[in-house]
């Protein structure tokens, strides 16, 4: 008898309740919040340098616009159908994401922020509520308070809640909420789920399983558990057990400590001169320092890297990086940029057209835990950085910046269709006329 049949025959418990809340077409939905004219109009959002399509509204999907498609290839369909195009606006999306997560935290004590537009909620202890009603209330509240539509899937494991969420998103009859809490409901959902769509089953494992005529998630759970462990390892076995209703992936309520932090960008056009590279590295060093300050962290070391366009085989190729030790743990932009500039000057080579560069910080630890004899200017350093962050936070990013970042920044990432930063820049606040 198969493992799943044993569980079902023994009426194994499905009492555990995990909800996955996923924002629908998140970037496109963010753009609609402050521009009601975009409701029901097709929208696409572009990747860095306005290269590829990374988000499509439901209306854009119906037009046949593909995820990851280069913008220039889709431009004919876009122009013909009056599709609204946006450059990615991560300041806006990050702030809206934070508002969604803060709202979700009001509904359950156990929350795992999984990505910018997804979170798991532990709903154990809420069984006295009718789950469907409670989840519908969550949806309405997020829409009313933040303006973002969400889909919610609930089941006994994370993997099953992912499947439930996918059904809620794709089938209107669920009205945005799908709950799989019985063996019958789970079996029917698994029959509708291609094996390649299962969380934890990548392209390689999907191809492997299809050789054995395993086409759906339901086919997968009919396998022998020992066979799965032998052929797919511990990770495959966990996915198998999760689909069988056995929770193996706990909610990550305390995010693991960050080990590194990176800021890198592709340039709008290739860079050849060292002074342009120095400007870009200064800007990235400043931004990565800001990011760790926001999280109350300091870095012990760093690396700087550059590379040419690997896909342009007509040009000479070069890539390099250098690891650098900081004099003492710091999050001071001036010190980090100074060290980064030393690094870029060492790895720069003339005669190449550089496409991308970046700065990575390592050895991150909480500022409160860092104490050292050499950290003699900590108080002064903190005061300067706090003032800089406060001004930039109020009046817009890079209002106060290091001179080494330059002024014109011809290399800057292409963002020709970016929307205003409605929630993070005073100059972009929506004005209401009476």
Tell where the protein language model's regions lie, with residue ranges.
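Short conserved micro-motifs at the rims of enzyme active sites and ligand-binding pockets
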Residues: 315-317, 369-373, 413
């Amino acid at each position: 008898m198969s493992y799943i049949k044993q569980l079902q025959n023994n009426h194994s418990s499905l009492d555990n309740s995990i909800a996955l809340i996923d924002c629908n077409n998140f970037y496109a939905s963010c753009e609609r919040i402050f521009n009601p004219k975009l409701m029901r109009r097709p929208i696409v959002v572009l990747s860095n340098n306005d290269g590829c399509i990374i988000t499509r509204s439901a209306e854009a999907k119906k037009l046949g616009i593909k995820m990851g498609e280069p913008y220039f290839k889709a431009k004919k369909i876009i122009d013909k159908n009056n599709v609204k195009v946006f450059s990615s606006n991560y300041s806006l999306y990050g702030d809206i994401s934070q508002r969604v997560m803060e709202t979700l935290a009001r509904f359950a004590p156990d929350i795992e922020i999984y990505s910018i537009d997804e979170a798991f909620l532990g709903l154990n202890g809420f069984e006295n509520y009718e789950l469907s009603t409670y989840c519908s209330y969550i949806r309405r509240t997020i829409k009313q308070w933040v303006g973002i539509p969400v889909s919610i899937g609930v089941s006994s494991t994370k993997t099953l809640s992912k499947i439930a969420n996918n059904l809620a998103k794709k089938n209107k009859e669920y009205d945005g909420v799908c709950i799989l809490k019985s063996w019958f409901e789970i079996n029917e959902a698994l029959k509708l789920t291609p094996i390649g769509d299962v969380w934890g089953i990548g392209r390689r494992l999907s191809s492997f399983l299809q050789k054995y005529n395993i086409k759906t998630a339901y086919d997968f759970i009919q396998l022998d558990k020992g066979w799965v462990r032998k052929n797919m390892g511990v990770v495959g076995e966990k996915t198998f057990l999760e689909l069988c209703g056995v929770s193996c992936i706990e909610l990550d309520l305390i995010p693991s400590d960050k080990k590194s932090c990176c800021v890198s960008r592709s340039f709008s056009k290739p860079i050849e001169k060292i002074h342009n590279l120095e400007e870009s590295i200064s800007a990235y060093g400043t931004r990565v320092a800001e990011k760790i300050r926001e999280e109350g962290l300091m870095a012990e070391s760093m690396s700087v890297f550059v590379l040419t366009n690997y896909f342009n085989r007509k040009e000479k190729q070069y890539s390099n990086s250098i690891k650098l030790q900081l004099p003492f743990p710091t999050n001071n932009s001036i010190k980090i940029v100074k060290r980064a500039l030393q690094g870029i000057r060492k790895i720069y080579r003339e005669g190449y057209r550089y496409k991308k560069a970046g700065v990575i910080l390592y050895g991150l630890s909480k500022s409160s835990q860092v104490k050292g004899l050499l950290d003699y200017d900590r108080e002064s350093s903190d005061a300067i950085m706090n003032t800089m962050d406060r001004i930039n936070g109020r009046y817009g990013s890079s209002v106060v910046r290091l001179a080494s970042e330059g002024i014109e920044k011809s290399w800057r990432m292409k963002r020709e269709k970016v929307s205003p930063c409605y929630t993070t820049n005073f100059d972009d606040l929506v004005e209401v006329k009476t």
